[in-house]
Each structure stands twice: as structure tokens, then as C-alpha cells.
């Protein structure tokens, strides 16, 4: 039973003491990593907006924070994946992190599950796009997963469907309908994870009742929620934990923790 934890939208910057929206991005990301690793995940995923200022130093800061958290927690082997958001520089993200970890587009396998990490970054814009090349790559990976008898989680930054917030829906995934039409044709696809919206969100990919759409809170700051927070903590940082079962079902729960900041190292 692989365990997956999703974190999203840390918005790190080059300076360790740098603040974004009035908060210490690094300190709050360090706390999120500690919370995540306490749950002993097999897979740890960061779904975009990794580096707010898109600097080389910011991605080094991200890499060092993850390395330090793993060492401090004496964590068991965990596979890490990252995807680029609108506040990212995909080439720098890959250059700094890609030697050791999976950077979108990429594949992460755990037991009878396959995690497909996709980039929705579009240069110069806040909205996202998958594009024909990645859609073709996705279908190739899904065909292989079906052959291998694996269930599939797909992860990206931008929500592939409207979430019910007018301002957010204008900067969602421009080819989201095309992506979802493709994914719904593959019975093995059971979950689509995304960030960008800085809040908990949960839905289904109709008419598929077995295909969940899950939006993740930010580790930095929350936006006004569309849906009630099931934990009653809509304004706290958070993440999402998913236990991926052998029968293709998913047991997931929202994670929240205090916004109290640690001293940045």
C-alpha cells in the first residue's frame, strides 16, 4: 500500500529570510516537509509554484530544504516528484532537482500504482496548458500502465476543471477539457491531483464516479475557499495524504497544521 503525500505552492525565493504575501516561505515549507515526512510517505509530490522569483538560488533553497528535512527525520526511502507552475522556471527546476528526483514530465512507480507528473507551465502566463506533446506522452504512459496492470494518479499544477471561483477559473488549464476527455477513457486513472488554487477542493470526473479530482492547499497561504474545509481550518497551511490501495481504491485525507513559522535555516 503506497502512501503519497502532496504539498503545493511553497513559493520559495532566493533569500532564506524572504517573505511572500507577508510570510516566510522557507520557514513554512520546512514545517510542511516535517509534517509530511512524519507520515512516512513512499511518494512525496510538490505540485508547482515551487519558486516564486524563479531564481537558481530559489531552487537550490528548495533542494537543500528537502535534503535537510529527510536527514533530520531519518526518513525511509521516499521518491520525490516536482511539477512546474506559473510561478516557476521549468529549466532551472529541472537543472537543480532533476538529477536526483522526478521533474515533470515524469513517471513514479510504487507497487501496483503509477504516478504521472505533468507540467502545465505556460511561459508568460498565469493560466496553464498541457499541450499536444504531453497529451501524447500521457496516453503512451497510460497504455503502458494498463498493460502492466497498474492504477494511475495524474498530477499537475493547474486545475483541469473549473472550481467555481470566477477569478481562479480564468487562470486554470486552457486545455483542461481535452485532458479530462483523454483521462476519463482510461479506467486505470483513479485520481487527478492539482495545486494552484491554495485551498482544499474535491470533485469527481463525471460520469466517472471512481475518478477523483483533488485540489491541494498551499504550504504558504490560503485563498478564500470555494468548499468548506472538512477540518474547519480553511486558512491554515496544508497538504493531502493518499493511501493507494491494491484494489485501485484510494483512502485520502486533508492535512492541516499551524501557520506558526519556524526560524529559517
From Swiss-Prot:
Annotated EC: 3.1.4.-
Manner of cofactor binding, per the entry note: Binds 2 Fe(2+) ions per subunit.
Gene Ontology MF term list: 3',5'-cyclic-AMP phosphodiesterase activity; metal ion binding; nucleotide binding
Binding site for AMP: 11, 49, 86-87, 198
Top-level taxon of origin: Bacteria
Pfam families: Metallophos (PF00149)
Binding site for Fe cation 1: 9, 11, 49, 198
InterPro entries: Calcineurin-like_PHP_ApaH (IPR004843), CNP_phosphodiesterase-III (IPR050884), Metallo-depent_PP-like (IPR029052)
Cofactor(s) listed: Fe(2+)
Alphabetical UniProt keywords: Hydrolase, Iron, Metal-binding, Nucleotide-binding
Residues the entry annotates as binding Fe cation 2: 49, 86, 157, 196
Family classification: Belongs to the cyclic nucleotide phosphodiesterase class-III family.
The protein, known as: Probable cyclic nucleotide phosphodiesterase SynWH7803_1390
